[in-house]
């Protein structure tokens, strides 16, 4: 009899515990849905912060400002509000005001590295061969041509920087700043692409071509850099020489009136600190100057390897625009 009573008592306690647990899980689930966090968000968020969040969520659900995106994070990370020098709000989240600059248009555009060694000649003719299908496909559609060029040109800096980063970690040594310089180059090329996306609206088959070309080129350049960094940097230097030529032809078409000289995209005006009222021609000018700087950096990097030295032994041209 006593054993039966103890069992029934234990069952009642267990049922009560299950009921309480269910109630608590419901409350926790409600808090999780409201605050976007977990159990810990209840214990770490201050009451005032919770009230602010509740107001924001309430306004959003009530059809307040539909453009305002309310992102609630348990980690307490809030994007900082950035303003320009004139006090207006900075609207780009892909780059910051301190990452902008004025392009050096005085750079020598005619510089050329004559191919003398076998590797130089192989790099030179590889670029020439790659240019032929581009000429056939895009012809004089220089906006789309620039878009394709930049999807390829943004790869070498990322590949080289990634491999140098891994090498630095393996050998427990500094990279001489080259890791940062090459990633800056890749980021700069990516901004070229973001700019020309505003000018040339790619068709579906051009987007498909970009995916194919980028996939092939990334892996080919990765393998090429592993085998011979001097060849990889030299090839990209020649590719940038071709880019300068392409943008020069782009400017000629703009001057002839064959391509409409539309207003410069807002992203280009902020990134290159262009004056208000700038046009597409101004954008092409600064992009061409960027390509000339990348040409110099990569030929310089190849020369360092040709001298039997490593990149870290020479100071990297960080911020060289």
Swiss-Prot record:
Q: How is its activity regulated?
A: When the two monomeric subunits are covalently linked by a S-S bond, the enzyme is essentially inactive. When the disulfide bond is reduced, its component sulfhydryls can associate with K-keto acids through formation of a thiohemiacetal, resulting in enzyme activation. Pyruvate increases Vmax, but not the substrate affinity.
Which residues of the sequence carry a binding annotation for Fe cation 2? 189, 240, 291, 294
Q: Which reaction does it catalyse?
A: 2 a ubiquinol + O2 = 2 a ubiquinone + 2 H2O
Q: Which residues are noted in the entry as Fe cation 1-binding?
A: 150, 189, 192, 291
> Which CDD domains does the entry link to?
AOX
For this protein, the parts annotated as crossing the membrane are 146-166, 208-228
Q: Please classify the protein's predominant subcellular localization into one broad category.
A: mitochondrion
Induction statement:
By salicylic acid.
* Domain of life of the source: Eukaryota
* Top EC group: oxidoreductase
Give the UniProt record's GO annotations in the biological process aspect: alternative respiration
Q: How is the cofactor bound?
A: Binds 2 iron ions per subunit.
The subcellular localization recorded is:
Mitochondrion inner membrane
Report the EC number(s), separated by commas if there are several. Answer: 1.10.3.11
* Organelle transit peptide: 1-41
Q: What protein family is recorded? A: Belongs to the alternative oxidase family.
Protein's job: Catalyzes the cyanide-resistant oxidation of ubiquinol and the reduction of molecular oxygen to water, but does not translocate protons and consequently is not linked to oxidative phosphorylation. May increase respiration when the cytochrome respiratory pathway is restricted, or in response to low temperatures.
The entry describes its oligomerization and partners as: Homodimer; disulfide-linked.
Q: What is this protein called?
A: Ubiquinol oxidase 1, mitochondrial
Name the gene for this chain: AOX1
């Amino acid at each position: 009899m006593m054993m039966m009573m103890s069992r029934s008592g234990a069952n009642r306690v267990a049922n009560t515990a299950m009921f309480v647990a269910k109630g608590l899980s419901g409350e926790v689930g409600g808090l999780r849905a409201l605050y976007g966090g977990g159990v810990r968000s209840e214990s770490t968020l201050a009451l005032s912060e919770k009230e602010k969040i509740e107001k924001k969520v309430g306004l959003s659900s009530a059809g307040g400002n539909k453009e305002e995106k309310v992102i609630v994070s348990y980690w307490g990370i809030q994007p900082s509000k950035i303003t320009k020098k004139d006090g207006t709000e900075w609207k780009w989240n892909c780059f910051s005001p301190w990452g902008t600059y004025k392009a050096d248009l005085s750079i020598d555009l005619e510089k050329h590295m004559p191919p003398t060694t076998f590797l130089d000649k192989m790099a030179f003719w590889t670029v020439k061969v790659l240019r032929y299908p581009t000429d056939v496909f895009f012809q004089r559609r220089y906006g789309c041509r620039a878009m394709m060029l930049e999807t390829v040109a943004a790869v070498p800096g990322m590949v080289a920087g990634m491999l140098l980063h891994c090498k630095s970690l393996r050998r427990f040594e500094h990279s001489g700043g080259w890791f940062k310089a090459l990633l800056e180059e890749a980021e700069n090329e990516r901004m070229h692409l973001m700019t020309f996306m505003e000018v040339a609206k790619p068709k579906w088959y051009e987007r498909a071509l970009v995916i194919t070309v980028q996939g092939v080129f990334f892996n080919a350049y990765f393998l090429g850099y592993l085998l011979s960094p001097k060849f990889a940097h030299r090839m990209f230097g020649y590719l940038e020489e071709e880019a300068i030529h392409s943008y020069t032809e782009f400017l000629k078409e703009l001057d002839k009136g064959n391509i409409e000289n539309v207003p410069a995209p807002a992203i280009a005006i902020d990134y290159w600190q262009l004056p208000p009222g700038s046009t597409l021609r101004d954008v092409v000018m600064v992009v061409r100057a960027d390509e000339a700087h990348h040409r110099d950096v990569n030929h310089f990097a190849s020369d360092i390897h040709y001298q039997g030295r490593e990149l870290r032994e020479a100071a990297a041209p960080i911020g060289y625009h």
